[in-house]
């Protein structure tokens, strides 16, 4: 393994809950690289205890305001909280103004609430590339509940399924054509649907539309409650927490499965990234010829891609080879 | 594993005390974003412990305080609180309307630079970039540091 500073002291300090260590560890995870990987490995055994709750929904629906009120409710129930608020990075400059936190002002004096703003850094899907690692840091630091706010919903936001045990899709009346704002994919990932800004006159219509959409779901799918909130007045938030807790106790076996899917996805992403870097930097003559043939249309892109990948991978067996499979490959 | 790469500089742009003039801080936040930095922007009226908590959790490299109509000498008190919280490596700049007599007090407290009305975008970006890089270089690497 490459010589890198030992992450162990940092792992110990963050597991003791030291906020500076937690903050530093999150930065390290965002940076990536071998120190991040070593730290992640060191804290992984201490994860899996926190309740993870995701808030997603169209821009301006009131996600941050609702998170602020929801966190207050979690605190009332005696739980410590970590919040990860993801905002988009500018595609032009790569910079960002991370503004979700503006609406989470009431927790500035409470050490029981740790808030971290994360920029999406070009990652699609409403989250950031390092989101799993960031959540693991807060989990290992002993936070009882971890609340994740995603970038306003697009269509590709199903990633939240891997990250959050309970997914809350926040809607609000009057955001254009209401139901159009909630894409089908988003509905399928929801554990709970919220119509926020229930003080607005069109709210009952939005509730009706959502319930109508839910009635079209396949049979056997879990019930999805539709709740109304007025986040700016803390109304409906206690009911929301009750629904979240009910949802979490209903399906405890999900956690292990989600974790496996999550690890699988991380491995797939890591492998894809590594392969991409290798192929982009590859100037082997035979490979250049393959590219030329693809450019001339003699072979299709998929074939060229598969050939490149297999040549790069070199048929090296996995380090922890299952004996039978290794035998079969050798013979 | 995640791809190792460079992380944009992270800057907290905020205002402490009763001063509500926020036009300058909004403009500066946009300047820094457009220069590729991640800006944690807060509304006015923050407290010193609040700023320390924010800077800790967000792991910022630089703090920019906009100060137009406060007791500017609140800034040295903030500097002291930052050092006490182990954030001595974080660079601090101030902008706004600060009388000259007070500017020297801020400098003595460790503020790197005070910008006045009409400060140019390039100057601000250049200063914050340099300060952020210095802050990263000087930070004791917490992950190899012994338990305090
Ligand atoms: C607009 C204004 C207001 C508006 C504010 C609107 C708003 N939301 O911001 C209103 C009308 C509300 C207002 C109210 C008051 N104001 Co007034 N206001 C001004 C005025 C005319 C312009 C300020 C401004 O917006 N400039 C435009 C911005 C873009 O410039 P800037 O803030 O200076 O920012 C630049 C630089 O300073 C620097 N910068 C600023 N912040 C930062 C931060 C960082 C990190 C960096 C790197 C750089 C940086 O970069 C910016 C771009 O160049 C100034 C006079 C003046 N000429 O500056 C008085 C002034 C600031 N106000 C003043 C006063 C006294 C008040 C009141 C107390 C008046 C009263 N008695 O009620 C109230 C207080 C309100 C409050 N709660 O804070 C005094 C302050 C005196 C002092 N320094 O001791 C001033 C200087 C007027 C004067 N000459 O007396 N005000
Ligand atoms: N009337 C009303 N307004 C609300 C309510 N909740 C939030 N708002 C307002 O809606 C606006 C958007 O709120 P945010 O919490 O920033 O919404 P968001 O979904 O986090 O927005 P993005 O992060 O930008 O996608 C703010 O002006 C809030 O004050 C509510 O229950 N009723
Ligand atoms: Mg938000």
UniProtKB/Swiss-Prot annotation, chain B:
Q: Which GO terms describe its biological process?
A: acyl-CoA metabolic process
- One of its Pfam families is B12-binding
Catalysed conversion reaction? 3-methylbutanoyl-CoA = 2,2-dimethylpropanoyl-CoA
Identify the InterPro entries for this entry. Answer: Acid_CoA_mut_C, Cobalamin-bd, Cobalamin-bd_sf
As one GO molecular function, the record gives: cobalamin binding
Keywords carried by this UniProt record: Cobalamin, Cobalt, Isomerase, Metal-binding, Plasmid
**PROSITE patterns, alphabetized:** B12_BINDING
Cofactors needed by this protein, per the record, are: adenosylcob(III)alamin
Q: Which domain of life is it from?
A: Bacteria
Q: What is its EC number?
A: 5.4.99.-
Give the practical application.
This enzyme and the derivative PCM-F, a variant in which the alpha and beta subunits are fused into a single polypeptide via a short 11-amino acid linker, have potential applications in bioremediation of pivalic acid found in sludge, in stereospecific synthesis of C5 carboxylic acids and alcohols, and in the production of potential commodity and specialty chemicals.
Q: Where is the B12-binding domain?
A: 8-138
The residues that the entry says bind adenosylcob(III)alamin are 21
For this protein, the record's NCBIfam families field holds: acid_CoA_mut_C
Q: What does this protein do?
A: Together with Xaut_5043, catalyzes the reversible isomerization between pivalyl-CoA and isovaleryl-CoA, using radical chemistry. Does not exhibit isobutyryl-CoA mutase (ICM) activity.
Subunit structure of this chain's protein: Monomer in the absence of the PCM large subunit. Weakly interacts with the PCM large subunit; an alpha(2)beta(2) stoichiometry seems to represent the active state of the enzyme.
Q: Which family does it belong to?
A: Belongs to the acyl-CoA mutase small subunit family.
What protein is this chain from? Answer: Pivalyl-CoA mutase small subunit
